Amino acid sequence: MSSGGLLLLLGLLTLCAELTPVSSKDRPKFCNVPPEPGRCNANVRAFYYNPRLRKCIEFTYGGCGGNANNFKSRGECKRTCAE
């Protein structure tokens, strides 16, 4: 296979992996914990995964502490936790 063909195959596999939803059995356990704003007062826009609604929701993060169900973008939250 030519290098162009290999590059195309690699690109298609990468795209497929990005578009494949995360199943609940593969979802990290921290995606199921409620959001924790932390103990500081920085008022940072963040996102957490809500397993009941099965989507990522915006919340205000204090900037320190908290838990792992805390993402800088909705996209990062979806890639990690959403089905």
UniProtKB/Swiss-Prot annotation:
Q: List the disulfide bonds.
A: 31-81, 40-64, 56-77
Matches recorded under InterPro entries? Kunitz_BPTI, Kunitz_BPTI_sf, Prtase_inh_Kunz-CS, TFPI/VKTCI-like
Could you list this entry's UniProt keywords, alphabetically sorted: Disulfide bond, Protease inhibitor, Secreted, Serine protease inhibitor, Signal
The protein's matches in PROSITE patterns, at most eight in alphabetical order, are given as: BPTI_KUNITZ_1 (PS00280), BPTI_KUNITZ_2 (PS50279)
Task: Site Reactive bond for chymotrypsin: list residues.
Answer: 41-42
Q: Name one GO cellular component term.
A: extracellular space
What are the residue boundaries of the BPTI/Kunitz inhibitor domain, all occurrences included? Answer: 31-81
Reading the lineage from the top rank, the first entry is: Eukaryota
Query: A Gene Ontology MF term for this entry?
Result: serine-type endopeptidase inhibitor activity
Q: Which CDD domains match?
A: Kunitz_textilinin-like
Pfam families for the chain? Kunitz_BPTI
What is the predominant subcellular site recorded for this chain?
secreted
Similarity comment? Belongs to the venom Kunitz-type family.
PANTHER family assigned: BPTI_KUNITZ INHIBITOR DOMAIN-CONTAINING PROTEIN, KUNITZ-TYPE PROTEASE INHIBITOR-RELATED
Query: What is the name attached to this protein's record?
Result: Kunitz-type serine protease inhibitor A
Q: Which organism is this entry from?
A: Bungarus candidus (Malayan krait)
